[in-house]
């Protein structure tokens, strides 16, 4: 769906399509345990978040050089542009690369070779968000932030992702305080598999400005009331929720109920290569299955720009919003 939109919940490593994975494996002499792209695609069947993460980290082995990260980002940007994305705030997971001996500079500089020219090449403005892996230690997160300091002119904010259960936001209080002191924006995954209390903790302890996922807020009327009152955006990922069994079927997704409650919801793709759809595909899926009206779809697109970190360029944001209003379905 080419409705103009911003994508705010997108893991760049999760855009690694099987074809590119094999291309990079051949380039770097990495042997993948799959005969071909078809066999690899069949492996994209997940029972839960952890089974997805196991494959996600396994395939990262093909990402070695600046050129690899540049090619990965450009492949995403080309697909996103074709689906109406005008602005993208892109997550990356440096700890997973540092652990493999890939330096922070290789990752950031490689991504920036694509992001720095994304407006000229793809018509998309971008921001880069460094995510900490919550199943790693708080000390590792602090070390990662320290390693990122030479590149903060290219990093807009920090996030928190990976396995949620058993890793509450409180664990990362210190690194989020350090990030805030550096002037970085703050978001965090919360309330996907973890309980509603993790959402409140992310707000109260980490000071996040957006909640990534946040689906389980619906279990707490008090939390919903707070999110509505404070206009805290939620970056929902419907096809991801189905694939990871957060909801049983798309028809059962609470997005319509959340919108009716006044929550500031956005629709995003999460890890589109693994979950069977980019952001435009997610829009089409919720339109068809959840029967969202054109007004609701326009609201989702409008929310995506309003929830973005474009405060430093209000003229651009206003232009994007006018494109949403002018769009004809």
List each model region and its residues:
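Metal-cofactor-binding active-site regions of metalloenzymes
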Residues: 1-184, 193-198, 205, 209-210, ...
């Amino acid at each position: 769906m080419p409705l103009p939109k911003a994508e705010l919940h997108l893991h760049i490593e999760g855009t690694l399509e099987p074809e590119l994975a094999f291309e990079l494996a051949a380039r770097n002499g990495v042997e993948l345990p799959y005969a071909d792209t078809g066999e690899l695609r069949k492996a994209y069947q997940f029972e839960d978040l952890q089974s997805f993460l196991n494959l996600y980290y396994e395939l990262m082995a093909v990402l070695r050089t600046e050129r690899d990260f540049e090619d990965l980002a450009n492949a995403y940007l080309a697909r996103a542009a074709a689906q109406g994305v005008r602005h993208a705030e892109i997550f990356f997971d440096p700890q997973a690369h540092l652990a493999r001996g890939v330096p922070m500079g290789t990752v950031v500089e490689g991504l920036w070779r694509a992001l720095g020219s994304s407006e000229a090449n793809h018509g998309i403005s971008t921001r880069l968000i460094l995510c900490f892996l919550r199943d790693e230690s708080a000390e590792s997160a602090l070390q990662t932030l320290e390693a990122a300091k030479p590149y903060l002119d290219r990093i807009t904010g920090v996030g928190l992702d990976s396995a949620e259960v058993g890793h509450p936001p409180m664990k990362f209080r210190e690194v989020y305080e350090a990030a805030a002191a550096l002037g970085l924006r703050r978001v965090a995954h919360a309330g996907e598999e973890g309980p509603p209390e993790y959402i409140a903790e992310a707000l109260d302890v980490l000071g996040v400005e957006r909640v990534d996922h946040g689906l389980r807020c619906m279990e707490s009327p008090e939390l919903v009331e707070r999110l509505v009152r404070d206009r805290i955006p939620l970056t929902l990922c419907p096809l991801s929720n189905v694939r990871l069994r957060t909801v049983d079927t798309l028809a059962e997704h609470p997005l319509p109920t959340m919108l009716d409650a006044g929550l500031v919801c956005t629709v995003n793709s999460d890890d589109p290569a693994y979950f069977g759809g980019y952001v435009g595909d997610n829009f089409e899926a919720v339109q068809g299955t959840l029967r969202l009206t054109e007004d609701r779809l326009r609201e989702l697109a409008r929310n995506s720009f309003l929830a973005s970190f474009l405060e430093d360029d209000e003229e651009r944001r206003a232009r994007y919003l006018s494109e949403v209003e002018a769009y004809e379905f």
